[in-house]
């Protein structure tokens, strides 16, 4: 790491913050594909055994400017020798080189080593674990919620304009604009959701960076207007797309947006407004009247259309009352219901009844969508009947069992905060029987004959793992253990939405 920092410091000193020359530095591409930097750069090594060459990079950049070479239709994009997905590894080398270089001005981990600056953690963005206290402590006291899907795609020039505030190299921005427009022409980046999925798989780091830049710009304006419209700050929680922390965020937005938003409408004032986001989905929750929520809805639509030039219909943003509708967020179905109770009180010779109806939070496991996710992963059919899963022939019985146990444990931990855990028994039953059928298929036997041979204790770990974990903290016979097993427990190893819980 010190070696690459020394290289970057040398280039920074010589080129005066110019990023374009870094495209011709071979250590940039080594930085992108080295095993030692995967955890930092969020890039999974995909098997680049050959070293990138300076001549290859120059040749590819030259071809980008040859318009005759780039005149390829969208239908032939899979056969494109330059941008083809998994057709030519050199095309991904240069595209991921773009991502590494454009992250340098935003990476305080490297910049702080040059300037001796300390990393400043922004208080505006919190960890994923702040979602759990929001569900437990804040949501029962709120009345209305709004499901907001952050619209995309956006115009490429808006992305370039966002990057221009931090990237000062005009040559690099020009080449980046040309690069993005070629993706746009081939219907790969900004046309359909399927196209974005292809682009995010072929260029994960580049996609994450562009998406994060767009989200940060949107939330900067949104939180600025929210704070300006109320004496109390807008309470916000959220995380970057597949990242836990945002190291720095511009705090002073007044000078930037004063010309665009000279007057803040007074009707947006609401000290009880909460904003929570994960990836591209966010919610607005308020204790106030639905009239204010409607005004916030049209305010968001106008912000997207007028500032980001993204079409969004107001009818796609639904305002729901928590007492009547469930909130689908992060793979949980959350609702607030009244828990009526009657208390008899006596004062001197007079006795009277007091009706009390406190609000209670219910977090329910979405059993039907979860079974649908298991069916897509080939653990069961569409009706929820377990089936055998295809596995590699060289896997041992212990490895197959361990994989099923790991999936079951992750789901059990993820939904440990649910109010009714009995529905998880059906999921565990599907995984257990699917594991038995998979092992029986490997041994060319039936599930009944295999269980009779190995004994039923072979798969009992599917139901006893959580109790054994809690027994390490409390005695197994104590009342506290039984109460915790029935109650809600949020595990700190939940750092992202579970793949099977993501039903969208």
UniProtKB/Swiss-Prot annotation:
It is found in: Plastid, Chloroplast. GO terms for biological process: mRNA processing; RNA splicing; tRNA processing. GO terms for molecular function: RNA binding. Keywords: Chloroplast, mRNA processing, Plastid, RNA-binding, tRNA processing. InterPro entries: Domain_X, Maturase_MatK, Maturase_MatK_N. GO terms for cellular component: chloroplast. Pfam families: Intron_maturas2 (PF01348), MatK_N (PF01824). Coiled coil: none annotated. Usually encoded in the trnK tRNA gene intron. Probably assists in splicing its own and other chloroplast group II introns. Belongs to the intron maturase 2 family. MatK subfamily. This is Maturase K. It comes from Fagus japonica (Japanese beech).
